[in-house]
Amino acid sequence: SWMLTGFPWLSLGYSQLESPLSGFAPIIGETGISALIVISATLFALIHNKRTFANAVLVALCLFTSGYLLKQHTWVAPQKNYSVGMAQGNIAQSLRWVPEQDGPTMDTYWKLTESLWDNDLIIWPEAAVPKLEPLAQPYLAKVNERAFQENTALITGIVNYNWETDEAWNNLIVLGKRTPDAAYPDYQYFHNNRFSKHHLLPVGEFV
């Protein structure tokens, strides 16, 4: 699963969403469930051996019964419901980074968001803003102010480039209200309202 770019594609644990083993997910995560699959396969192999049959069946029974019981447990209790709106511009990849398309692309997302302002959170795709963050400040300020006025938060992906260090980052930034009690628009360039992706992936956003 690590052959493509080092990212865990199609890990074994994802295959157990409907099985009793998924009950272990809140405790050991997807990687732990992958390990349990290997253990389970070993146990099933040992079942065919007369000397290890009884022990293998007992351990397998305990493993899957434990998973089933854990799956019945409610691990989190929702405290509040939040409404989320998502905008997908479906911009063709061939036009994504064409400078002449910057304006039309950003206009598309602005228009798509007009019907979403009443949500608690609005989500734009990873490269919704096709300009480097330092060059997109007027547009980001506009979205930031509007989101604040509408009492909501908007998160979007954008590429940031540091001219001093010659480093580029694919960032997730927050515009508008990061917290409900914020007294002013949250976004500032190079503020801590961002998360920089640590691993780039060869995937597109066109649906």
Specify the residue positions occupied by each region the protein language model found.
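Membrane-embedded alpha-helical bundles of multi-pass enzymes
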Residues: S1-H73, E114
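Soluble catalytic domains of enzymes that build or remodel membrane lipids, polysaccharides, and related
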Residues: Q72-V207
